[in-house]
Amino acid sequence: MRAFLDLNSEEIVAWLKENNEKSFRLKQINEWIFKHGELDFNKMTNLPVRLREKLKENFLLPSLKIIHSKKSRDGQSIKYLLKLKDNLGIEAVLLKYRYGNTVCLSTQVGCKMGCKFCATGLGGFSRNLTAGEMIEQILVLKASSSEKITRVVLMGSGEPLDNFTEVLKFMRKINEKDCLNISYRKITVSTCGMVPQIKALAEEKLPVTLAISLHAPDDALRNELIPINKRWGLAELLDAAWYFIDKTGRRVSFEYALIENVNDTVEHALKLAQLLQRKLVHVNLIPYNTIEKRNFKTPSVEKINKFKEVLKRAGIPVTVRRELGDEIDGACGQLKAKYFEV
């Protein structure tokens, strides 16, 4: 039996027609699910009883369950530990900013990439999430918090472009007017550097934001921190980024976690500036969040500001990311499913 949210609109309309039902029923079903948060076909009372019975016989509705949630002291972030139908665990985070509410979602259970400073890969990789399971995360966080979701970032556990087909399907579906109606411009896709998939995403010409986890300004250091760099080095990665800009007209965001005595010197900043000058980019500096089992530390505020100033003087737009959720293991690099460790 298929999960209803795994199907795109064309697939559902085709199923309705095969079962002698009118295609407008899809809009009614979507209204129940996405507007009212109703996840029981029986309670969709403007559908004929016969259709409700057919839906129950053929499709599963969301089964994602909240196992645990933890709110930050300032109330601006909530981390959720969620259990999938096969009892595997994933994490999602609700982040409240002045401009609206952002959800940080997982795209895989675990991760294959093995980045040396990240917590997610410590537990290994289990499987990809389906498009429906990504949508479920939004529905669960929305229902639990009673907050309107305005932005989506795919920066939870997993490498989004390693699950390219399902991520693409997910983005298309949440963009639909009768579903969540989230603008592509309010979706951020993160990657540690899967070059062919960056180019494939560019070919789709969706005006999403691409966020590249760079974290080093040269191949020698990046090879140490991000193993996938040994397959596609900086030159290839940057070529793919410029290709994405050319195809979409969208600025690329480069994420750079500042780690004490690893990648945080003025020399590193100068190298980074040289790589990115005169390009349509933005640099997000992320003060490293200390992680248990990772022997890295956060630089001083003085070093962070010096690094930032070098980039600013080079004319590169740069911000120091305001981290919400670090105290609840919910910030970048800290999405750990401690609850599920046995």
UniProtKB/Swiss-Prot annotation:
Query: Which protein are we looking at?
Result: Probable dual-specificity RNA methyltransferase RlmN
Instruction: Give the residues annotated as active site.
Output: 91 (proton acceptor), 332 (s-methylcysteine intermediate)
Q: Which residues are involved in binding S-adenosyl-L-methionine? A: 158-159, 190, 213-215, 289
EC number(s) on file: 2.1.1.192
Question: Which NCBIfam families does the entry mention?
Answer: rRNA_mod_RlmN
The record's listing under SUPFAM superfamilies reads: Radical SAM enzymes
Function, in words:
Specifically methylates position 2 of adenine 2503 in 23S rRNA and position 2 of adenine 37 in tRNAs.
Q: List the disulfide bonds.
A: 104-332
PANTHER family this protein is in?
A: 23S RRNA METHYLTRANSFERASE, RADICAL SAM CORE DOMAIN-CONTAINING PROTEIN
Q: What is the lineage of its organism?
A: Bacteria, Bacillati, Bacillota, Clostridia, Thermoanaerobacterales
Chain positions recorded as [4Fe-4S] cluster binding sites = 111, 115, 118
User: What GO MF annotations does this protein's record show?
Assistant: 4 iron, 4 sulfur cluster binding; metal ion binding; rRNA (adenine(2503)-C2-)-methyltransferase activity; rRNA binding; tRNA (adenine(37)-C2)-methyltransferase activity; tRNA binding
Q: Name one Pfam family in it.
A: Radical_SAM
